[in-house]
Design a protein with these regions (language model features):
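Pyridoxal 5′-phosphate
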Residues: 1-121
Length: 121
């Protein structure tokens, strides 16, 4: 869990991910509480997997995404179509994905203002 929503602890994600790499371990992070509220760049943080839920940054409920680093070795457990780059068969809710995308753009565009509000409080 990157950010704990109850006690506010923020895990030093990059440091922990680098430790995992040192020992050859794969790392998954629950970033549900941090994406859209905290600057994250998965090209600089070596996590292998991360989970995100759109409703946590004012996006539609019932949609999210899984970050899966190329070369992680994860393979599909559900056979079928080639959706989700062959990782998950099924029809994507395009309207919900579009809503999530827009909500995430708006959340990151307003990140500085949200930080000011938090500092004020």
């Amino acid at each position: 869990m990157h950010v704990n929503n109850e006690i506010g602890v923020i895990l030093p994600l990059k440091k922990v991910a680098e430790m995992c790499k040192t020992y050859g371990a794969l790392m998954h992070s629950d970033t549900v509480q941090s994406v859209g509220h905290y600057p994250l760049d998965f090209s600089e943080i070596p996590v292998d997997f991360a989970a995100v839920a759109a409703h946590k940054f004012h996006g539609p409920k019932g949609v999210g995404f899984a970050f899966i680093r190329r070369g992680s070795g994860l393979s599909s457990m559900i056979l079928g179509g080639g959706q989700e780059r062959g990782m998950r068969a099924g029809t994507e809710p395009v309207y919900a994905v579009a809503g999530m995308t827009q909500a995430l753009k708006l959340a990151y565009a307003d990140l500085d203002n949200q930080a000011k509000v938090e500092d004020y409080l």
